[in-house]
Amino acid sequence: MRKRSWLTSAISLLILVVLSCSPQGNNLSIQVWFSPGGGCTDAIVGELNKAKKEILVQAYSFTSQPIAKALVDAHKRGVRIEIILDKSRRTEKYSAADFTSHMGVSTYIDGAHAIAHNKIMIIDNETVITGSFNFTKAAEERNAENLLIIRSKQLAKDYLDNWEKHKAHSEKYIGR
């Protein structure tokens, strides 16, 4: 009960911070999803399928086949995709890094930190997907996770600035 209360408080605080930082007319929209079994993966895939220009990803663990396939499908539609992953993905047995890089998606490894623990997507410079949800089957089916889909150009810009800092020190992943 305490953990749930803490999680609810943390999410509420995040929403208040986002709302207070948003300029008027930013057309802020927030959707929240929970797992297990709450449709987080489907929500992410739905957003990826709507992308028109660009999807930027930072992920710690990334083994979800539906999400990897949606990214590759977007790449085939001409959407620019770039993925930054934690250094542990080089050796993870079921990492999507090999699949995405072999399919032509620009994939990078961030080895500059003890753990590159971000879980974000920036879509078309206006939508941010973030939360505790790792892009994995376990996160969808077994773990207690949360996911936010936030439509805000200003927030997307803030996340983009941070994403670019991480890309600057990341190395291109060419697969195994």
Question: Where are these predicted regions, by residue range?
Answer:
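Positively charged n-region of N-terminal signal peptides that target proteins for export
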Residues: 1-5
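Bacterial Sec-dependent signal peptides at the C-terminal "C-region" and cleavage site
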Residues: 8-28
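Primarily the HKD phosphodiesterase
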Residues: 44-106
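Extracellular/periplasmic catalytic domains that process cell-envelope and extracellular macromolecules
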Residues: 49, 100-101, 113-116, 121-124, ...
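Structural recognition of the beta-strand scaffold that forms the well-ordered cores
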Residues: 56-58, 82-85, 108-109, 121-122, ...
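Signature of lipid phosphatidyltransferase scaffolds
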Residues: 127-176
